[in-house]
Amino acid sequence: MTFNLGRRAIVAGAVAVLSFGAPVLADGHKVLDSIHFLIPGGAGGGWDGTARGTGEALTNAGLVGSASFENMSGGGGGKAIGYLIENADSNHGTLMVNSTPIVIRSLTGVFPHNFRDLTLVSGTIGDYAAMVVGKDSPINSMADLISAYEADTSGTAIGGGSVPGGMDHLVAAMVMEAAGKDALGVKYIPYDAGGKAMAALLSGEIAALSTGFSEAVDLANAGEVKIIGVTSDDRVSAAP
């Protein structure tokens, strides 16, 4: 069975004010003395990893003197968005990492603020979504997951590191819809970022996990989980 779903969100940095108080230089010279990353989710998730990886890359390249990080969970990213907008004047050197749900949830009225109140600075990564199960799970394929869902819809819980209506939830629902099942019937369990969601999968709390491919591939290579589906048009060589 083939599932041809959309690609996972491209993660972008967002900043309320673009004045960093330092001149922009070129040719490998330092651009900023320091930069602060506001992360709208918990530790170990995709936003967290992207922010810390970006900060490390900027400092290692000598473009930024130092990078600091702050996790601010709540409201599916809404707490951090509201904080950055409402405190823009005191956050000139702050970047917030986010992804497609910032647009989706703004358009659906979930956030009291609008993504247009922020300035998108850059796209940093693109990632596929992946459906993942534990190494000892009897589920070995997407067909197995669909069969388990058919047999016990409420007992086949799918977790994710985003709130209901977020990207992980949407991907799980799209999988079931593509298989001709009721997308609204998915029992989705949200966790505060991908790290906690993965821990729930490893402990057997959920039957499957909807997450970013990059968040699962290392554990899959280590034999701790099985990637049973990826939202790419073609097979991914890292998870054939």
Residue ranges and their predicted role:
Residues 6-11:
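N-terminal export leaders
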Residues 19-23:
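N-terminal signal peptide c-region/cleavage motif recognized by signal peptidases
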Residues 26-117, 181-208:
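N-terminal (or domain-start) structured segment
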Residues 38-42, 128-138:
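A bilobed periplasmic-binding-protein/Venus flytrap-type ligand-binding module shared by bacterial periplasmic
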Residues 84-85, 172, 201-202, 220-223:
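Hydrophobic residues within well-ordered alpha-helices
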Residues 93-95, 112-130, 157-159, 227:
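A structural signal for short loop-to-beta-strand junctions that line the ligand-binding cleft
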Residues 134-154:
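Flexible hinge/capping segments at coil-to-helix
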Residues 215-240:
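C-terminal lobe and pocket-closing loops
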